[in-house]
């Protein structure tokens, strides 16, 4: 609202009239789909309203009111800014200033979000010459009313003095690249900006601005006539532009304000407004997002073609063909792979995949030319069943997979151009498919390519420092391309409504058969697809200190090659889900499982007694290096059971022994903290007389101080002391764990000395993603195979205070926690607790405990 006096009754009446007319247009839009009609109608309604205000202010006919930006195009979204220019003659009466200010104020009073400027023609030209943003805004100037002669004079001078087509092209392309960089150069954002993201409306507007500035036309039809795009491409551009405009308009209507970001909260409503309905396999929002990603992908592809074509017109090449790459098929032209003529793919369908093999293997080629991209785009009918079954194409595809470098770039380009989905039809089904599982932050196709990229990085010397152990393993792994095939198929069956691992096996088996992959390699690929989740589930959800767990896992993998392949795929898979999911702790769990299993496969028996003896001997050797007296450990070790020594490695046993050997019968809590040996975490040791609420009390402290528990290993000594170890991370900010270790020791020891009752759990706020896509909380309590403990499995949306809420319920029922494995997967948790409690065999107590836990973890 403007800063002038309160609106008059007449202004309020006019505002109500305008609001009612706009509401009528929006209501009609809700039941129709023609967004262009809506945008034009909103522009006309705004024109009429502004004219009435202009007349009321008595502004002279020597001025002109000009619409600029989107309003200038006549494309006003429901809650867009209304950008106007009051154009003044060079010589004007300064007394007009007050009336112009009144006009702008009254326009605000209508309820319009006005963006205004007041300039002479000379000022417009001067500012446009210096600022490409002003230049762009004025490019689409449209006279609403006022002096026609003044507006025409402005238009002529603007095009003659302010607009340089080449400079404008360079500036807008740079601006587009910078904008894309803000969105990580991908249209596949979880919450895309329909206007600004790569493949969004701004890309389409940028192309039309560049074309208009160059005099090539201001519509897709005109660009088609000019020969810059084909009729088919123009049709595709109009279709996708219409969808994006409609989506943006519906977001505005649903939100009741300007809303260009397709946030989680609005995705379901937006989907339903387009008529999408949930199915058994897909949410309505997932269907809408897939449609959006396909549109953004097509816009990105066509924009690349158009920009290269316009650039070729504005900057004629000074040099032509650099070299011939494939006789009568491809040449290199200015670093781009170009077909020799537009009929290459029609004459030689096998050249389609050859293009990507050449891109992958030819040094100096940095991409595909506009001519090649266009030919690919228009070759969809060629990429049919006959093309997919062609022996040469299958051979070329395997060559692309088996090159020593360039594989990731080649497959990304194949996906961007839709060739990958045309060759592997089941891959096409998952392109743009969102996964609202609170775990993956990429669409299925992008996740698959990310996993492929991660495996490739293991094999590239320049990246060996990132994951040295993985790089070492893949360096000795024969035919690593089998891992790339497994990566392509491990999630290819997502969204089909069944077990994607089982369905993916059939796809992988068929691929191997059709591409001549031998028996052993084919068997490994199919097995990897079937078991790609197995290793992470064992490492993160089972007690790997239990020899039986290791024995069962070793039986599944069978040999070292299978174990190594599964380990490499698992690390790449977890790292390819979300930047938040992977951490060094999970890395250690997987590496430990790999090494233990490898020893078993090599003939070592998973024998608890021999493992216990080995770890104790190693720990004693470390203690001697620390100058701990020879028999000093006995007082503590005599109180510890076998489980303690199997759950901790030798270095950890030595550290805990060194801390506690003088305090075996301590009267007060002993708390020690140190940076975790695996990094990126804090290890906290607690030694104190045991009590039922101890675990919950420790969790309450961590919760209140922003520390997130990754792992808990709980032991009880023979003389009634708790010896608990926690791995925690700081949840809110980057922190040096060495700096906070002393503070944690002091605060937690003080907290444990208090006798106050457990505080009420604080139900921390869920993330927007979790609020929009809540998962059904699950609690499962059952006896373990030996009947010694009970296993509690909890699955829920992650939130601050969740672990403490669980621990408090257990404490209230005097149920002891023997061990806890905290598994955070993005926005959800899947926690496993090993419980001991005398009353847990009572079915009524089990039901009561499960009921209270469900209530505690509910959203």
Swiss-Prot record:
Notes on activation and inhibition: Uridylyltransferase (UTase) activity is inhibited by glutamine, while glutamine activates uridylyl-removing (UR) activity.
Ranges where the HD domain occurs: 444-566
Organism superkingdom: Bacteria
InterPro entries: ACT-like_dom_sf, ACT_dom, HD/PDEase_dom, HD_domain, NT_sf, PII_UdlTrfase/GS_AdlTrfase, Polymerase_NTP_transf_dom, UTase/UR
Catalytic activity: [protein-PII]-L-tyrosine + UTP = [protein-PII]-uridylyl-L-tyrosine + diphosphate; [protein-PII]-uridylyl-L-tyrosine + H2O = [protein-PII]-L-tyrosine + UMP + H(+)
Keyword terms of this UniProt record: Hydrolase, Magnesium, Multifunctional enzyme, Nitrogen fixation, Nucleotidyltransferase, Repeat, Transferase
Region listing for Uridylyltransferase, in residue ranges: 1-325
UniProt cross-references to Pfam families, sorted A to Z: GlnD_UR_UTase, HD, NTP_transf_2
Required cofactor names: Mg(2+)
Gene3D superfamilies: 3.30.70.260, Beta Polymerase, domain 2 (3.30.460.10), Hypothetical protein af1432 (1.10.3210.10), Nucleotidyltransferases domain 2 (1.20.120.330)
GO terms of molecular function: [protein-PII] uridylyltransferase activity; phosphoric diester hydrolase activity
An annotated GO BP: regulation of nitrogen utilization
The enzyme's E.C. designation: 2.7.7.59, 3.1.4.-
Region of interest: Uridylyl-removing: 326-682
Annotated ranges, domain ACT: 683-762, 791-859
Function: Modifies, by uridylylation and deuridylylation, the PII regulatory proteins (GlnB and homologs), in response to the nitrogen status of the cell that GlnD senses through the glutamine level. Under low glutamine levels, catalyzes the conversion of the PII proteins and UTP to PII-UMP and PPi, while under higher glutamine levels, GlnD hydrolyzes PII-UMP to PII and UMP (deuridylylation). Thus, controls uridylylation state and activity of the PII proteins, and plays an important role in the regulation of nitrogen fixation and metabolism.
Domain notes: Has four distinct domains: an N-terminal nucleotidyltransferase (NT) domain responsible for UTase activity, a central HD domain that encodes UR activity, and two C-terminal ACT domains that seem to have a role in glutamine sensing.
Family per similarity comment: Belongs to the GlnD family.
HAMAP family from the UniProt entry: PII_uridylyl_transf
Protein name per Swiss-Prot or TrEMBL: Bifunctional uridylyltransferase/uridylyl-removing enzyme
Organism listed in the record: Burkholderia vietnamiensis (strain G4 / LMG 22486) (Burkholderia cepacia (strain R1808))
Gene: glnD
């Amino acid at each position: 609202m403007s800063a002038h006096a309160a609106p008059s009754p007449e202004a309020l009446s006019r505002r109500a009239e305008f609001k009612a007319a706009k509401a009528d247009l929006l209501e009609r839009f809700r039941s129709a789909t023609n967004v262009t009609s809506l945008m034009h109608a909103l522009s006309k309604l705004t024109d009429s309203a502004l004219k009435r205000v202009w007349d009321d202010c008595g502004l002279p006919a020597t001025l002109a009111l000009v619409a600029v930006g989107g309003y200038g195009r006549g494309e006003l979204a429901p809650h867009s800014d209304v950008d106007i220019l009051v154009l003044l003659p060079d010589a004007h009466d300064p007394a007009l200033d007050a009336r112009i200010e009144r006009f702008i104020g009254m326009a605000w009073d209508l309820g319009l979000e006005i963006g205004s400027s007041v300039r002479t023609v000379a000022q417009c030209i001067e500012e446009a010459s210096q600022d490409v943003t002003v230049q762009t805004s004025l490019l689409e100037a449209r006279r609403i009313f006022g002096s026609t002669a003044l507006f025409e004079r402005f238009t002529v001078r603007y095009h003659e003095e302010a607009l340089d087509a080449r400079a404008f092209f360079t500036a807008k392309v740079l601006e587009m690249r910078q904008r894309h960089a803000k969105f990580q150069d991908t249209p596949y954002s979880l919450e895309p900006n329909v206007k600004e993201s790569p493949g969004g409306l701004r890309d389409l507007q940028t192309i039309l601005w560049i074309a208009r500035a160059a005099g090539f036309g201001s519509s897709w039809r005109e660009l088609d006539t000019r020969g810059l795009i084909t009729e088919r491409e123009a049709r595709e551009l109009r279709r996708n532009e219409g969808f994006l405009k409609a989506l943006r308009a519906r977001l505005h209507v649903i939100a009741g304000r300007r809303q260009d970001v397709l946030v989680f909260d609005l995705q379901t409503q937006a989907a339903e407004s387009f008529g999408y309905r949930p199915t058994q396999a897909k949410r309505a929002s997932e269907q809408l997002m897939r449609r959006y990603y396909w549109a953004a992908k097509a816009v990105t592809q066509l924009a690349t073609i158009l920009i290269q074509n316009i650039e070729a017109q504005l900057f004629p090449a000074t040099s032509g063909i650099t070299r011939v790459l494939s006789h009568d098929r491809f040449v290199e032209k200015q670093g781009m792979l170009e077909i020799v003529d537009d009929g290459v793919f029609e004459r030689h369908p096998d050249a389609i995949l050859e293009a990507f093999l050449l891109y992958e293997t030819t040094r100096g080629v940095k991409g595909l030319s506009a001519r090649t991209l266009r030919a690919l785009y228009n070759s969809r009918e060629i990429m049919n069943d006959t093309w997919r079954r062609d022996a040469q194409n299958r051979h070329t595809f395997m060559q692309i997979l088996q090159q020593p470098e360039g594989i990731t770039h080649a497959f990304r380009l194949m996906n961007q151009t839709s060739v990958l989905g045309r060759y592997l039809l089941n891959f096409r089904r998952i392109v743009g498919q969102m996964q609202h599982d609170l775990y993956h932050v990429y669409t299925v196709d992008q996740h698959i390519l990310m996993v492929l990229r991660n495996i490739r990085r293991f094999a590239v010397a320049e990246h060996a420092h990132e994951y040295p152990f993985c790089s070492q393993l893949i360096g000795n792994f024969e035919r690593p391309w089998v891992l790339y095939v497994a990566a392509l198929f491990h999630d290819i069956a997502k969204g089909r409504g069944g077990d994607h691992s089982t369905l993916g096996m059939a796809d992988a088996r068929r691929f191997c058969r059709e591409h001549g992959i031998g028996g052993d390699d084919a068997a490994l690929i199919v097995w990897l697809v079937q078991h790609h989740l197995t290793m992470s589930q064992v490492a993160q959800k089972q007690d790997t200190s239990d020899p039986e767990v290791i024995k069962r896992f070793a039986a599944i993998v069978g040999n070292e090659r299978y174990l190594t392949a599964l380990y490499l795929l698992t690390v790449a898979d977890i790292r390819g889900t979300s930047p938040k999911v992977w951490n060094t702790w999970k890395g250690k769990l997987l590496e430990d499982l790999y090494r233990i299993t490898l020893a078993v496969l090599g003939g070592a028996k998973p024998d608890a007694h021999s493992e216990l003896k080995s770890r104790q001997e190693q720990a004693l050797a470390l203690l001697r290096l620390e100058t701990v007296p020879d028999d000093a450990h006995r007082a503590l070790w005599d109180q510890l059971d076998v489980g303690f020594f199997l759950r901790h490695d030798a270095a950890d046993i030595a550290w805990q022994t060194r801390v506690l050997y003088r305090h075996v019968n301590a009267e007060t809590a002993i708390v020690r903290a140190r940076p975790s040996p695996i990094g990126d975490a804090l290890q906290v040791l607690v030694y104190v007389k045991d009590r039922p609420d101890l675990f919950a009390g420790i969790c309450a402290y961590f919760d209140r101080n922003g520390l997130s528990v990754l792992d808990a290993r709980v032991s009880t000594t023979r003389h009634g002391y708790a010896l608990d170890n926690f791995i925690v991370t700081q949840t809110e900010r980057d922190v040096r764990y060495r700096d906070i270790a002393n503070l944690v020791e002091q605060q937690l020891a003080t907290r444990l000395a208090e006798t106050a009752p457990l505080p009420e759990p604080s139900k921390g706020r869920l993330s927007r993603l979790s609020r929009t896509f809540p998962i059904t909380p699950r609690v499962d309590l059952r006896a373990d195979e030996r009947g010694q403990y009970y296993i509690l499995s909890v699955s829920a949306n992650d939130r601050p205070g969740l672990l403490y809420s669980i621990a408090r319920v257990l404490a209230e029922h005097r149920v002891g926690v023997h061990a806890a494995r905290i598994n955070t997967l993005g926005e959800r948790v899947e926690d496993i607790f090993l419980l001991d409690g005398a009353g847990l065999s009572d079915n009524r107590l089990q039901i009561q405990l499960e009921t209270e836990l469900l209530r505690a973890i509910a959203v």
